[in-house]
């Protein structure tokens, strides 16, 4: 039985999961968080499911060695490829994954047209198709794969003209099709909200699932009597790329500095 004071492992293909990490820390400030950014293998969205499962198994094993009491797959593509596999490997481990916010978007739309920005891997998955079948029968869903977007966000420069131009190229067709609700189907994309605010009308809802994932983690930890009790927890970081790169990006995306260690390939 894990201790309440044990850490929670959070992983992503890169820095996108920091958007989820922030929501977890906001809701559960007493938790100690371990974050692995698999930047040496980013992006996951264009890689095979088998490759992604291998990476997720490797990282889950690391969290297990660190004594983590729960794990969050803060990556839509990793969830699609690996969550079932990891639940089979670790059946007693509280495990939270991501999925595009199809249900709340379908409820929120007024025009009946919902746009989805996501990676190719997420959009082509059976899990995403099942979400549409379950929650989006009464709305039109227009999907937009966004190759290249994750790589630009990984640089930490969220105001570059190249990023702005690429994002507009993906968003403009959705707006032209009448979308009044946009789903951010990748954990990297919430960092683009300031850019999106200048591109989409004020009455277009932009939805992601970071806060919902934090609430689900809270429910699972509570159900297993694993919620940490003061003092405030901290966050520690690992990366499969150059640690110095993540150290420079953390103040931009995490709004704090952090200790970053190398994660063995």
From Swiss-Prot:
Single annotated GO MF = glutamate racemase activity
Gene Ontology biological process terms, A to Z: cell wall organization; peptidoglycan biosynthetic process; regulation of cell shape
Pfam families, from UniProt?
Asp_Glu_race
UniProt: substrate binding residues: 12-13, 44-45, 76-77, 187-188
- List the catalysed reactions: L-glutamate = D-glutamate
Its UniProt pathway annotation is: Cell wall biogenesis; peptidoglycan biosynthesis
Q: Which InterPro entries match?
A: Asp/Glu/hydantoin_racemase, Asp/Glu_race, Asp/Glu_racemase_AS_1, Asp/Glu_racemase_AS_2, Glu_race
Role, per record: Provides the (R)-glutamate required for cell wall biosynthesis.
Supply the PANTHER family for this chain. Answer: GLUTAMATE RACEMASE (PTHR21198:SF2)
What is the name of the protein in this document? Glutamate racemase
Q: What organism does the UniProt record list as the source?
A: Pseudomonas putida (strain GB-1)
Ranked from the top, the taxonomy reads: Bacteria, Pseudomonadati, Pseudomonadota, Gammaproteobacteria, Pseudomonadales
């Amino acid at each position: 039985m894990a201790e309440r004071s044990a850490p929670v492992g959070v992983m992503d293909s890169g820095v996108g999961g920091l958007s989820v990490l922030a929501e977890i820390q906001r809701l559960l400030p007493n938790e100690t968080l371990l974050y692995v950014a698999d930047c040496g293998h980013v992006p996951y969205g264009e890689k095979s499911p088998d490759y992604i499962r291998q990476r997720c198994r490797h990282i889950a094993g690391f969290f297990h060695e660190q004594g983590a009491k729960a794990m969050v797959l803060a990556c839509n593509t990793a969830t699609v490829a690996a969550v079932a596999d990891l639940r089979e490997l670790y059946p007693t481990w509280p495990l939270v994954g991501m999925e595009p916010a199809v249900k709340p978007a379908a409820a929120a739309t007024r025009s009946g047209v919902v746009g989805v920005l996501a990676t190719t891997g997420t959009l082509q998955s059976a899990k995403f198709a099942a979400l549409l079948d379950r929650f989006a029968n009464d709305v039109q869903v227009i999907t937009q794969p966004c190759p290249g977007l994750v790589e630009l966000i990984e640089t930490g420069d969220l105001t570059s003209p190249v990023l702005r131009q690429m994002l507009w190229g993906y968003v403009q067709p959705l707006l032209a099709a009448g979308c009044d609700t946009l789903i951010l189907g990748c954990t990297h994309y919430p960092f683009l909200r300031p850019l999106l605010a200048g591109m989409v009308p004020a009455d277009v809802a932009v939805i992601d699932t970071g806060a919902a994932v934090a609430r689900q983690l809270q429910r699972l930890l509570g159900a297993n009597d694993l919620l940490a009790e003061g003092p405030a927890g901290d966050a520690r970081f690992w990366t499969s790329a150059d640690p110095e790169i993540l150290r420079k990006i953390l103040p931009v995306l995490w709004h704090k500095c952090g200790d970053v260690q190398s994660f063995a390939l």
